[in-house]
C-alpha cells in the first residue's frame, strides 16, 4: 500500500519516481543556474518532512558498522578561509536500500555506485598541496574502501605498463588522503536499481544526471536551501542541505602560454615558499581545443562520523571542490584555472576565497598521501595520463549538523536566472551533419509537396557500454504508473463535488483500472464503476460512471491501491468533499472503454447465470428432482440482486515491523493503516454476519416450501390417476365419433356427386332455353317481314282493282254512249 499525503496548495500530487526524477534533472540542466551570494539567507521551508522510509534506510545503514578515524587525528588546515577543522574530519556516506516496502535491493549495485562516485572524486584530487602540511597517520581501511579495492582489482587494465603505473600511483595517493573517510551518497531509489556507469568523455553520463535528480528530489521534499557561502556562526540554526544542481557553461579557454622545460618550469609555477598555487595546473603547449563543458554537482550530502560529531561546532560546514580540466580525447591538455579567469570573470558563480579554500582542502590530502620519491614531473605526467579522457567536473560538498532536513530553491533559482538575464544553457554539441537530399531535376509543376535539401543532423546516443539500459529488476509499468496518472489528471476536467453521506452510504462503487493492478498499483486511477439508483450520488446527479476520483476529503487517491481507496470511502462521515476528474466532451478514453467492457462482461455473466438457474428450474419441474441440503449450502445465493459493495479484500502479505523501522512517524503511519484495516474488517464481519443470518432464514423458508411441495406432489399423483381414467373414456368416445365421421364423409361424397349432376342438367336446360329463345325471335322476325310483304302486295292489288274498276266503268259508259 502506497502512502498518500493530503495535497497542499503547492505540494505535488504524487510521490517521486525514478523516471520523473531523471526528467526533472534534464530540465534543470537546461536552465541557467545562478548561485546565491554568501550573505543570502536560507529560503523559507515548505513545511514538508521526509517520509518514514528515509529514516528507516538511514538507520539500517548506520548499523552496517564502519570504522572511522578518531577526531584528534584530523589536523586543521592553516590558511583556509572556510571550514578549517571540518574539512579534515572523516566523512560518512551511507547508501540506503530501496525506500518502498515490497522491493528487493541489490546491495552490490549500490556499493558499486558509491565506489564509482568516490573513485571519481579522489581520482581528480591529485594536485600538490603546500609542503608544510604533515601527512596524516595511516588508519585501518573501511569496508567501503576494501570493497572498492576489490572492485578496482577486478577491472581489467585498459592500457600498457605506463598506464598501470600511473594508476597505481594515483591509487596510493587516494588511499593516503582518504583513509579516514567514507564517501556516502544518500540516494532514494523508488524501486529502481538501474545501473549507473562512469562519466563519458564528451558529455555528462546518466550517472551524474540521476544523482543530480535524486538530490534535487530530496531537497524539494524538505524545502530548505543552503547558500554556498561562508559557514554560519556557532549559534546559527543547524541545517543539512541536500541540494544538488548542475551548473554548466560552455567557454573557449585562452591559448595556453608556452611551458618552460625542466625544473625551471616547475620552480616558475610554484608560489612563494616552494608551494604550487592550488588554482593553476601547467601542461605542455597544445593547440587550443574545442569548447568544453563545465558541470557542477553540488552540494552532495556528507555526514561526519560519530566521533567527530560530538566535538564539532553546531554550525560547521564541510565544503570541498574538485576542479578538473579535461582536454580532448586525443590527449591534449591546456592550462586552466579554478579561480575566475580575467577573460571569464563570471564563468562560475563561486566566490574566489571559496574556490581557493575548497581546492586547497582537497589538495592537502593528496599532497600528504603522495609518495616522497615522486617528482613534480611524474605528477604532471600522471595528470596528463589521467585527465586526457575526463570531463571538466566541479564537485562541491556541503554538510551541516542536525536532523535530515533540507530545502529546494529550484523555483527561486529559475526566477533569479530570469532576472539576471544570463544566457541559457547550451549543451555540448553531440550531432553530426550529413548531406541532405539532392535537388530534383524535373519536379512536376502541379505538385504541392517539396522535399527539403538542408543538411540532416544526426545525434549520437550513449552506447550500451556507457549506459546500461537493462532494467530487469523493475516493472516498467509500475515505475511509470504515477507519471501516467499525473499526465492523465492534467488532461481531465477537474471540479469539486460535495455529497451528504446517508445511512445507505454514498451510493457509488469504485474500480481500480490499470495494467499493474495485480501488484496493487492502479496505473489508470480509481474510477466510479456504478452509481446506485436512489443513492446520494444518484440524487445529486453530478457524479457519473467513468469519473476519476482524484481526492476524497483532502486525501489524494492518485497512485493508491483499490483497497486503500475503498477504506477511505468507508471511513468518510457527514458531508464528503470529492475532487472529480472527467473526460472533456467529445473525448472517449481507453478507461471508459475498459469500464464499459467490464460492465458488459458482468452483465453478460449475470444473464448467463440467470439463464442457467432458469434451466435448472425447468429441469426440476420436469424430472421432479430437487437439490439436497448440502447443495443448498454450497450454492450461491443472491437474495437482493447484485450489491455495490465498497469494501475490498486487503493485501495480507504486508511487511512486518522490524527493529530498524521502529520510528515514531513509521509507527504512527502503520497504526493509522491498521486502524483503517480494522474498521474495514469489522465492517466486512458485520456484513458477513448479516448475510449469514439472512441465509439461515432463507434456508428455513426453503425447507418449509419443500414440505409443501412434497404434499402437493402426492395430491397431483392422485389427480393424475383420475385423469388417466378420463383419458381412456375419451379415447373410446373418440373412436365412435371417428366411425360416425367416416359415414358422414361417405354420405357427403354421394350428395356431392348428385349435386354436381343436377348442376350439369341445369346448365344444359339453361343452354337449351337460350337457344329456343333465339329461334323464337328469329321466326317472329321472319313472320313480321312476310306480313309486311303480304300487306304491301295487298295494297298494290287493291289499287289495281280500283283502277280496273274505273276502267271498267269508263268502258261501260262509253259503250253505253
UniProtKB/Swiss-Prot annotation:
UniProt xrefs under Pfam families: PDZ, PDZ_5
Ranges in a coiled coil: 595-616, 665-816
Outcome recorded upon mutating residue 116 to A: Diminishes phosphorylation
Cell inner membrane keyword on record: no
Domain PDZ: 496-584
Annotated stretches, region: Interaction with RGS2: 480-525
PROSITE patterns xref list: PDZ (PS50106)
Tissue expression: Ubiquitous. Abundantly expressed in the brain. Expressed at highest levels in hippocampus and at lower levels in the cortex, cerebellum and brainstem. Localizes to the dendritic spines of neurons. Also localizes to aspiny neurons, such as GABAergic interneurons.
Compositional bias of kind Pro residues: 131-141
Biased composition (Basic residues): 44-58
UniProt-annotated location(s): Cytoplasm, Cytoskeleton; Nucleus; Postsynaptic density; Cell junction, Adherens junction
Record-given protein name: Neurabin-2
Amino acid at each position: 500500500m502506497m502512502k498518500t499525503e493530503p495535497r497542499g496548495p503547492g505540494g505535488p500530487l504524487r510521490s517521486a519516481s525514478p523516471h520523473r526524477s531523471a526528467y526533472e534533472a534534464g530540465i534543470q540542466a537546461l536552465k541557467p543556474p545562478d548561485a546565491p551570494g554568501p550573505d543570502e539567507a536560507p529560503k523559507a521551508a515548505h513545511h514538508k518532512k521526509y517520509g518514514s522510509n528515509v529514516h528507516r534506510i538511514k538507520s539500517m545503514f548506520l548499523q552496517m558498522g564502519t570504522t572511522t578515524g578518531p577526531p584528534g587525528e584530523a589536523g586543521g588546515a592553516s590558511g583556509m578561509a572556510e571550514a578549517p577543522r571540518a574539512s579534515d574530519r572523516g566523512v560518512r556516506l551511507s547508501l540506503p536500500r530501496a525506500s518502498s516496502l515490497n522491493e528487493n535491493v541489490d546491495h552490490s549495485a549500490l556499493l558499486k555506485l558509491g565506489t564509482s562516485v568516490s573513485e571519481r572524486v579522489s581520482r581528480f584530487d591529485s594536485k600538490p598541496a603546500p609542503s608544510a602540511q604533515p601527512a596524516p597517520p595511516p588508519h585501518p581501511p573501511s569496508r567501503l574502501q576494501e570493497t572498492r579495492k576489490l572492485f578496482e582489482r577486478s577491472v581489467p587494465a585498459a592500457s600498457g605498463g605506463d598506464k598501470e603505473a600511473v594508476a597505481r600511483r594515483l591509487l596510493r595517493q587516494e588511499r593516503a588522503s582518504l583513509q579516514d573517510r567514507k564517501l556516502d551518497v544518500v540516494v532514494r531509489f523508488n524501486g529502481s536499481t538501474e545501473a549507473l556507469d562512469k562519466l563519458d568523455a564528451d558529455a555528462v553520463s546518466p550517472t551524474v544526471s540521476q544523482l543530480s535528480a535524486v538530490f534535487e528530489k530530496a531537497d524539494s521534499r524538505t524545502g530548505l536551501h543552503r547558500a554556498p557561502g561562508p559557514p554560519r556562526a556557532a549559534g546559527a540554526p543547524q541545517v543539512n542541505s541536500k541540494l544538488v544542481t548542475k551548473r554548466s557553461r560552455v567557454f573557449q579557454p585562452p591559448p595556453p602560454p608556452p611551458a618552460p622545460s625542466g625544473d625551471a618550469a616547475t620552480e616558475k609555477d610554484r608560489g612563494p615558499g616552494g608551494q604550487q598555487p592550488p588554482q593553476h595546473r601547467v601542461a605542455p603547449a597544445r593547440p587550443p581545443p574545442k569548447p568544453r563543458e563545465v558541470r557542477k554537482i553540488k552540494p552532495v550530502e556528507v555526514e561526519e562520523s560519530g566521533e567527530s560529531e560530538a566535538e564539532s561546532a553546531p554550525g560547521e560546514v564541510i565544503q570541498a571542490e574538485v576542479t578538473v580540466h579535461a582536454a580532448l580525447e586525443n590527449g591534449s591538455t591546456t592550462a586552466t584555472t579554478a579561480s575566475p579567469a580575467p577573460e571569464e570573470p563570471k564563468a562560475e558563480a563561486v566566490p574566489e576565497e571559496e574556490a581557493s579554500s575548497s581546492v586547497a582542502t582537497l589538495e592537502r590530502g593528496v599532497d600528504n598521501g603522495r609518495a616522497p620519491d615522486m617528482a613534480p614531473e611524474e605528477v604532471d605526467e600522471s595528470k596528463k595520463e589521467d585527465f586526457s579522457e575526463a570531463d571538466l567536473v566541479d564537485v562541491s560538498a556541503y554538510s551541516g549538523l542536525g536532523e535530515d532536513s533540507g530545502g529546494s530553491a529550484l523555483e527561486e533559482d529559475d526566477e533569479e536566472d530570469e532576472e539576471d538575464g544570463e544566457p541559457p544553457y547550451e549543451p555540448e554539441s553531440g550531432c553530426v551533419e550529413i548531406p541532405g537530399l539532392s535537388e530534383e531535376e524535373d519536379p512536376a509543376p502541379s505538385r504541392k509537396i517539396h522535399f527539403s535539401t538542408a543538411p540532416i543532423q544526426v545525434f549520437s546516443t550513449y552506447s550500451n557500454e556507457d549506459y546500461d539500459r537493462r532494467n530487469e529488476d523493475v516493472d516498467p509499468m509500475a515505475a511509470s504508473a504515477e507519471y501516467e496518472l499525473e499526465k492523465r489528471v492534467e488532461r481531465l476536467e477537474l471540479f469539486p463535488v460535495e455529497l451528504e453521506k446517508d445511512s445507505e452510504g454514498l451510493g457509488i462503487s469504485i474500480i481500480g483500472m490499470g495494467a499493474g493492478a495485480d501488484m496493487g498499483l492502479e496505473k489508470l486511477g480509481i474510477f466510479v464503476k456504478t452509481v446506485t439508483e436512489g443513492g446520494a450520488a444518484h440524487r445529486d446527479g453530478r457524479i457519473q460512471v467513468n469519473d476519476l476520483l482524484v481526492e476524497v476529503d483532502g486525501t489524494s487517491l492518485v497512485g493508491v491501491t483499490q483497497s486503500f481507496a475503498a477504506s477511505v470511502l468507508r471511513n468518510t462521515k457527514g458531508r464528503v468533499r470529492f475532487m472529480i476528474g472527467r473526460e472533456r466532451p467529445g473525448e472517449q478514453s481507453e478507461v471508459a472503454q475498459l469500464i464499459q467492457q467490464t460492465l458488459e462482461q458482468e452483465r453478460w455473466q449475470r444473464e448467463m447465470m440467470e439463464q442457467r438457474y432458469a434451466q435448472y428450474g425447468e429441469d426440476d419441474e420436469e424430472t421432479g428432482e430437487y437439490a439436497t441440503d448440502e447443495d443448498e449450502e454450497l450454492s450461491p445465493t443472491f437474495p437482493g440482486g447484485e450489491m455495490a459493495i465498497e469494501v475490498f479484500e486487503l493485501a495480507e502479505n504486508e511487511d512486518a515491523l522490524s527493529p530498524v523501522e521502529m520510528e515514531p512517524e513509521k509507527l504512527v503511519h502503520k497504526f493509522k493503516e491498521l486502524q483503517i484495516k480494522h474498521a474495514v474488517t469489522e465492517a466486512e464481519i458485520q456484513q458477513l454476519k448479516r448475510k449469514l443470518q439472512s441465509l439461515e432464514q432463507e434456508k428455513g423458508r426453503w425447507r418449509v416450501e419443500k414440505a409443501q411441495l412434497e404434499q402437493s406432489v402426492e395430491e397431483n399423483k392422485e389427480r393424475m390417476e383420475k385423469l388417466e381414467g378420463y383419458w381412456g373414456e375419451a379415447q373410446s368416445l373418440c373412436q365412435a365419433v371417428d366411425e360416425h365421421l367416416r359415414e358422414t364423409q361417405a354420405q357427403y361424397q354421394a350428395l356431392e356427386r348428385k349435386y354436381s349432376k343436377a348442376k350439369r342438367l341445369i346448365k344444359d336446360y339453361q343452354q337449351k332455353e337460350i337457344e329456343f329463345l333465339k329461334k323464337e325471335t328469329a321466326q317472329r322476325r321472319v313472320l313480321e317481314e312476310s306480313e309486311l310483304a303480304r300487306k304491301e302486295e295487298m295494297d298494290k292489288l287493291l289499287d289495281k282493282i280500283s283502277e280496273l274498276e274505273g276502267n271498267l266503268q269508263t268502258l261501260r259508259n262509253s259503250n253505253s254512249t
